[in-house]
């Protein structure tokens, strides 16, 4: 019987393996695998000694020497910041999650639809009942259908393609931008109603969306970032939003955000997180790095590992 050690300890419940997730893993992996869950780093390193597979959020390069039988190192995350994948010895397969593209695509689609239907309009900002200030007339020329609009998805890997497929299902024309056609981005941006960033932080894309690229966008354009915060010049984006240079933005990731996924800025808050939320432009929607939240998150991860031959 082969052994898989599961060390998925994380503050957010959907990212933490508890009894229901472990039961799902046993069902998905089948009887040929023995499942061992660890809660502490020391317990994980002990269990790693005779494990063929490890499912983790983070893995240090020195740990490979403690895992002579390891054949698969898997992490649910798509980002590569927490796993020493470059140091994996020959014979060890490193697997990064791609399943959450479908979840993140729903988050992007939710913003797109809510924006088009006027859900974020300032006319609706009051929490009071409408009363005499019934905003129906004011809202009547602010809504539109998304079918026939144009989206540019930058970062067209598994996550980006899932986002593109979801938007295409809504009737949106999608152009994907990857390393192969990165030079096309300025031209494509000029016709974008939706500019979606789904980039990891290790691809040399720091401040890809800067004042120059923003100036290429139509005034009707909205920016979405569900990749990593390093891809945006936040000062330039805030200025464009405040001036009405672009129509809106949805940011799920930021420069210097708290927690283990903070970028190389040393944890220093970027321009968006440094501003009190009430002072942010009203056409900016911010979320706490939650575009992949789903109660089924880890079960989807385990199914992907099974389908990809890791279990």
Protein language model features and the residues they cover:
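Rossmann-like dinucleotide-binding domain for NAD(H)/NADP(H)
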Residues: 220, 228-311
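Short glycine-/small-residue-rich Rossmann-like dinucleotide-binding loops
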Residues: 59, 78, 198-201, 227-228, ...
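Rossmann-fold NAD(P) dinucleotide-binding segment
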Residues: 59-68, 85, 204-223
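N-terminal glycine-/charge-rich "phosphate-binding" loop or analogous flexible N-terminal tail
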Residues: 1-51
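Phosphate/diphosphate ligand-binding glycine-rich loop within oxidoreductases
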Residues: 49-129
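Short acidic low-complexity segments
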Residues: 38-47, 61-64, 177-192
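Rossmann-like dinucleotide/phosphate-binding beta-alpha-beta segment
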Residues: 138-219
